[in-house]
């Protein structure tokens, strides 16, 4: 499974990338607002830190305007992945962009039917939103499961990018089902390492080692 971080905070991105665990970054207009920086400036810096795909989202809703914004975003860096909404115009733009060799991430996916269309349009990634479905009492993991089954049925190469991930359990369940990628906030990715027995065991080992009076180096 690939790990993407869902943020436009350069400090968090750099910290996670230095761990060697980061495969890419996803951003959106809300995260750019939170970062409080110019979209081109911050996206360019992110692309210089991370070698993998960096999703930058168009804000236009009509095909020709989407293509114009996509052209501008793609000039920022070679590892830009154009993020598009799952609408008819977004799918049309996806088809055109992938045909031209661009990476694409079709976002705001809430149904298997939508995911099927994204794959037909040649999307590099499709982003089903787990947490937002959970919010309306629909099991978001069921959607990941359905998409995985459909893509496997037909051999689609579109990667399932599990999004709106809020808990470490979301990450585990997505991995068990077979999502190709998970994108999560920095805090959620860092929380994956945590377990009380790990902390307790380390504390015991260190206490016992101190009693030996030895040093390794």
Swiss-Prot record:
Keywords: Cytoplasm, Pentose shunt, Schiff base, Transferase. The keyword Transferase applies. GO terms for molecular function: aldehyde-lyase activity; transaldolase activity. One of its GO terms (biological process) is carbohydrate metabolic process. PROSITE patterns: TRANSALDOLASE_1 (PS01054), TRANSALDOLASE_2 (PS00958). It is found in: Cytoplasm. Pathway: Carbohydrate degradation; pentose phosphate pathway; D-glyceraldehyde 3-phosphate and beta-D-fructose 6-phosphate from D-ribose 5-phosphate and D-xylulose 5-phosphate (non-oxidative stage): step 2/3. Its EC number is 2.2.1.2. GO terms for cellular component: cytoplasm. It catalyses: D-sedoheptulose 7-phosphate + D-glyceraldehyde 3-phosphate = D-erythrose 4-phosphate + beta-D-fructose 6-phosphate. CDD domains: Transaldolase_FSA. The active site is at 83 (schiff-base intermediate with substrate). SUPFAM superfamilies: Aldolase. HAMAP family: Transaldolase_3b. Transaldolase is important for the balance of metabolites in the pentose-phosphate pathway. Belongs to the transaldolase family. Type 3B subfamily. This is Probable transaldolase. It comes from Sinorhizobium medicae (strain WSM419). The lineage of its organism: Bacteria, Pseudomonadati, Pseudomonadota, Alphaproteobacteria, Hyphomicrobiales.
